Design a protein with these regions (language model features):
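C-terminal transmembrane beta-barrel domains of outer membrane proteins
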Residues: 190-350
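Extracellular loop and loop/strand-boundary signature of outer-membrane beta-barrel proteins
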Residues: 19-21, 54-56, 94-99, 136-146, ...
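Outer-membrane beta-barrel initiation region
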Residues: 1-82, 118
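Transmembrane beta-barrel outer-membrane domains
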Residues: 24-28, 59-63, 74, 101-107, ...
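Transmembrane beta-barrel wall of Gram-negative outer-membrane proteins
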Residues: 58-164
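Flexible, solvent-exposed coil segments and beta strand-coil junctions
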Residues: 9-16, 43-50, 86-94, 107, ...
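Short loop/turn motifs that connect adjacent beta-strands in outer-membrane beta-barrel proteins
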Residues: 10-12, 40-46, 75-80, 117-125, ...
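Transmembrane beta-barrel strands of outer-membrane/channel proteins
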Residues: 16-22, 31-33, 47-53, 81-87, ...
């Protein structure tokens, strides 16, 4: 007679997620580790911690950063709090003199979103954010400057989707945002500086998805309008490695611009000689636009790249191999590499 024993998974195992990566070469090392958990303290909340440490022997630099974040519901609101601290040290050579320079930074950010109303299948949400950062810069253990940065914004987001016949699904999103940015620097030996300005931006995004001949086809894009006083944190990235392989580490972020991406996923199939491993292929093409601007007349133009990816999915691991190449670049912010961009990533369950 067979005997069956019930095994129950520990409640922490289903909630904790670990991540990490390490880059080690002759110049130095760069490593990071993170842990995240869902519904650990209360229902529908999320908490996470990240730490990064990097050292470069060639540049004689040493830096580290740590941050913790917590997202939780409060009545009809979704609140997110994030706090972090970072430091760096590096050697500076100036006019034959070599000395040590260092800096520290402390940051706190709070954001909230709230559903407002819904009309004609479109949901409207209110968004508010505030963040502050205090930094110090020193040379040879003597204070050079203290700076303070503050950023506040409020906005309205409208989003909606519709499923048409034959499996065609379309989604749209519009974000209108306005706010103020404040930056001040105190110098012990010279005049202080203060800079405060307002800004606005409007961003449109849309996607269309459909399954055809068992392949999943998607077209999605984003375009942004903004004034020239927009903080760099609100810039839109129109081309770069975070979007597609093929740009060989180059990235372009601008005040106003947009991008359009077409990609397709193959149906999954079993890998031969690899029991329980499924694989699929992805083809993608992306093009970014930078409109002409008198303030940045040397950056306008286009950049495009294509990518082929192979994904392997096993019971306890996921592996991705991507090969991309830039097709063309008419903006001076990028150059067309003479070799393809190859990436490999793997994640394993613990």
């Amino acid at each position: 007679m067979d005997t069956f024993q019930e095994e129950r998974e520990h409640w922490l195992r289903s909630r904790l997620k670990f991540s990490g990566k390490t880059k080690l070469n002759s110049d130095g090392l760069d490593g990071s580790v993170g842990v995240a958990a869902d519904s650990l303290v209360g229902q529908n909340d999320a908490i996470g911690f990240d730490y990064r440490d990097a050292r470069s022997y060639g540049n004689d630099t040493d830096s580290s950063a740590a941050s913790i974040r917590y997202r939780f519901p409060a009545w009809a609101n979704q609140l997110r709090i994030e706090a972090g601290r970072s430091r760096y040290d590096h050697a500076v050579s100036d006019a034959g003199r070599r000395y040590n320079a260092s800096g520290e930074s402390r940051a706190l950010a709070v954001s909230a979103s709230r559903p407002l109303f819904s009309r004609f299948g479109i949901a409207f949400d209110g968004i508010a954010r505030h963040q502050g950062r205090d930094s110090t810069f020193s040379e040879e253990n003597s204070l050079v400057s203290e700076s303070r940065y503050q950023f506040s914004s409020v906005g309205l987001e409208a989003s909606g989707g519709h499923e048409f016949g034959a499996g065609l699904v379309a989604n749209t999103r519009v974000l209108a945002l306005s706010g103020r940015e404040f930056h001040s620097t105190d110098y012990p030996s010279q005049d202080d500086t203060v800079d405060e300005r307002g800004f606005y931006k409007v961003a449109f995004s849309a996607s269309v998805e459909q399954e055809l001949f068992q392949w999943n086809w998607r077209v999605n894009g984003r375009y942004q309008f903004a004034d020239e006083d927009l903080p760099s944190s609100e810039y839109i990235t129109v081309a770069g490695p975070s979007m597609l392989a093929g740009f060989n580490g180059q990235s372009v972020s601008v005040v106003s611009g947009g991008w359009l991406r077409l990609d397709t996923d193959s149906p999954a199939w079993s890998m031969p000689l690899m029991d329980g491993v499924l694989s699929r292929v992805n083809f993608a093409v992306l093009q970014g636009w930078i409109p002409y601007s008198g303030a940045r007349e040397d950056r306008f133009g286009k950049a495009s790249a294509g990518q082929v990816s192979l994904k392997l999915q096993g019971r306890t691991f996921t592996a991705n191999v991507s090969v991309g190449r830039m097709i063309r670049a008419s903006t001076t912010a990028m150059t067309t590499p003479d070799h393809p961009d190859v990436r490999f990533s793997m994640s394993m369950g613990i």
